[in-house]
Swiss-Prot record:
The lineage of its organism: Bacteria, Pseudomonadati, Pseudomonadota, Gammaproteobacteria, Pseudomonadales. Belongs to the chorismate synthase family. It catalyses: 5-O-(1-carboxyvinyl)-3-phosphoshikimate = chorismate + phosphate. GO terms for cellular component: cytosol. Pathway: Metabolic intermediate biosynthesis; chorismate biosynthesis; chorismate from D-erythrose 4-phosphate and phosphoenolpyruvate: step 7/7. It comes from Pseudomonas putida (strain W619). Homotetramer. PROSITE patterns: CHORISMATE_SYNTHASE_1, CHORISMATE_SYNTHASE_2, CHORISMATE_SYNTHASE_3. The keyword NADP applies. Pfam families: Chorismate_synt. This is Chorismate synthase. Reduced FMN (FMNH(2)). It is an enzyme of class 4 (lyase). HAMAP family: Chorismate_synth (MF_00300). Keywords: Amino-acid biosynthesis, Aromatic amino acid biosynthesis, FAD, Flavoprotein, FMN, Lyase, NADP.
């Protein structure tokens, strides 16, 4: 099975299944000397882990990460960093009734056709459980980026039909939804409570922002920074769309509105989302992710079995009624991994490039 590694100079490889004994990751290319601790990684893992509120899956996984290699006396050595998280709360019997059935909107049908064999327990490799290792690896990237003045953070900007206006970063860590508007939290809670009573699920929109990124990151033509971000963010489970900057709203904009004019004091807008011609402009990099509703619900759905016979499928087990609630740390991790990789690639080729033109901020 290919496709388990992302990056060229800063690479992240993951392995493991939802109900296997453990999840693992190998992070390669991190420069030596970076101060890193278990607490650095655990902070983001605790933000993503299941069972932290009544609005997420009740699977209880501590997601305690172990560093197996690449760190000595609290600093990276420049060697491969091995990471491990043990699975502790699998209930595989919940899935025995559907081992020969294909759950609608899941990867069951496509994995079956591609490989001829699949781990049906909790979705196996296709489960969002895999993203725990991305978050652990992304924490390393975030720690290094911080030494370069780069900060990556995200928030939920929509849950189902409820749009969430951005008010303050201070609110994001104070509620289960990563909502930047504290006044919206009661409405979000009421909506999710009703959704559980309906035994249904809903989608969400996540916004992730990187500030402090210098101009110059991105490798035209095929490795444009926005293309790489779209690739990485689309690889997250349940993501069905990615926008950079104004995204699809730019369709209705006129050129006089969309163009981000430059002044000696800074850019006048950021419709480009901090990327021009596939290269970072120095403005905040802004991406939006659309996540589909969770496919695992107890409302019967029509499908077929492995022999092609019609069946009704009811998915048991413990699932998130909205996967977007826990997606913010995952989106942050993937953006950080992309920026880390491109920072090292830019440094390798263009470290000696100097221009007299000032770096503009955004007004």
């Amino acid at each position: 099975m290919s496709g388990n590694t992302y990056g060229k100079l800063f690479t992240v490889t993951t392995a493991g299944e939802s109900h296997g004994p453990a999840l693992v990751a190998i992070v390669d290319g991190c420069p030596p000397g970076l101060e890193i601790s278990l607490a650095d990684l655990q902070h983001d893992l605790d933000r993503r882990k299941p069972g932290t509120s009544r609005h997420t899956t009740q699977r209880q996984e501590p997601d305690e990460v172990e560093i197996l290699s690449g760190v000595f006396e609290g600093r990276t050595t420049g060697c491969s960093i091995g990471l491990l998280i043990r699975n502790t709360d699998q209930k595989s019997k919940d899935y025995s009734a559907i081992k020969d059935l294909f759950r609608p909107a899941h990867a069951d049908y496509t994995y079956h056709h591609k490989y001829g064999i699949r781990d049906y327990r909790g979705g196996g490799r296709s489960s969002a459980r895999e993203t725990a290792m991305r978050v652990a690896a992304g924490a390393i990237a975030k720690k290094y980026l911080a030494t370069q003045g780069i900060q990556v953070r995200g928030y939920m900007s929509q849950l189902g039909p409820i749009e969430i206006p951005f008010k303050t970063w201070d609110s994001v860590q104070d509620n289960a939804f990563f909502s930047p508007d504290p006044d919206k939290v009661p409405e979000l809670e009421a909506y999710m409570d009703q959704l559980r009573r309906d035994q249904d699920s809903v989608g969400a929109k996540i916004t992730v922002v990187a500030e402090g990124v210098m101009p110059g990151l991105g490798e035209p033509i095929f490795d444009r920074l926005d293309a790489e971000l779209a690739h990485a963010l689309m690889s997250i489970n349940a993501v069905k769309g990615v926008e950079i900057g104004a995204g699809f709203a730019s369709i209705a904009q006129r050129g006089t509105e969309h163009r981000d004019e430059l002044t000696p004091e800074g850019f006048l807008s950021n419709n480009a989302g901090g990327i021009l011609g596939g290269i970072s402009s120095g403005q905040p990099i802004v991406a939006h992710l659309a996540l589909k509703p969770t496919s695992s619900i107890t409302v019967p759905g029509r499908s077929i079995d492995v022999d092609g016979n019609p069946v009704d499928v009811i998915t048991k087990g413990r699932h998130d009624p909205c996967v977007g609630i826990r997606a913010t740390p995952i989106a942050e991790a993937m953006m950080a991994i992309v920026l880390m990789d491109h920072l090292l690639r830019h440094r390798a080729q263009n470290a000696e490039v100097k221009v007299a033109t000032p770096v503009l901020g955004q007004l």
